[in-house]
UniProtKB/Swiss-Prot annotation:
HAMAP family: Ribosomal_uS8_B. GO terms for biological process: translation. Part of the 30S ribosomal subunit. Contacts proteins S5 and S12. Keywords: Ribonucleoprotein, Ribosomal protein, RNA-binding, rRNA-binding. Coiled coil: none annotated. InterPro entries: Ribosomal_uS8, Ribosomal_uS8_CS, Ribosomal_uS8_sf. One of the primary rRNA binding proteins, it binds directly to 16S rRNA central domain where it helps coordinate assembly of the platform of the 30S subunit. One of its GO terms (cellular component) is ribosome. This is Small ribosomal subunit protein uS8. It comes from Salmonella arizonae (strain ATCC BAA-731 / CDC346-86 / RSK2980). One of its GO terms (molecular function) is rRNA binding. It holds the Pfam family Ribosomal_S8. The lineage of its organism: Bacteria, Pseudomonadati, Pseudomonadota, Gammaproteobacteria, Enterobacterales.
Length: 130
């Protein structure tokens, strides 16, 4: 069976892994998933990530906890295959009044809403993380 929305699957694996207090979660890898994982690591939502395997690469995310609680309180898919959501540089949303991030796919790569605003770029809103 083919997967319809691999990014939603990635976010669900992170959500479920933290709900079950797992140390790490693995999933099939792609360039977009690695780019999203890189943003999550830079923003401190996950500990680390690595890609293993040549023929079927697997992405392993090491989840992050603070005082026994998951760092990621909520992670929500916004733009999906059936309904893409694009925003211009002036329309980029602030998640939880700036406490969370929106992961945005721009022409210059995947970045946070803050970085996209500073670069003067809009793009596809992939997900909200808080």
């Amino acid at each position: 069976m083919s997967m319809q929305d691999p990014i939603a699957d990635m976010l669900t694996r992170i959500r479920n892994g933290q709900a079950a207090n797992k140390a790490a979660v693995t999933m099939p890898s792609s360039k977009l998933k690695v780019a999203i994982a890189n943003v999550l690591k830079e923003e401190g939502f996950i500990e680390d990530f690595k890609v293993e395997g040549d023929t079927k690469p697997e992405l392993e995310l090491t989840l992050k906890y603070f005082q026994g609680k998951a760092v990621v309180e909520s992670i929500q898919r916004v733009s999906r295959p059936g309904l893409r959501i694009y925003k211009g540089k002036d329309e980029l949303p602030k998640v939880m009044a700036g406490l969370g991030i929106a992961v945005v796919s721009t022409s210059k790569g995947v970045m946070t809403d803050r970085a996209a605003r500073q670069a003067g770029l809009g793009g596809e809103i992939i997900c909200y993380v808080a």
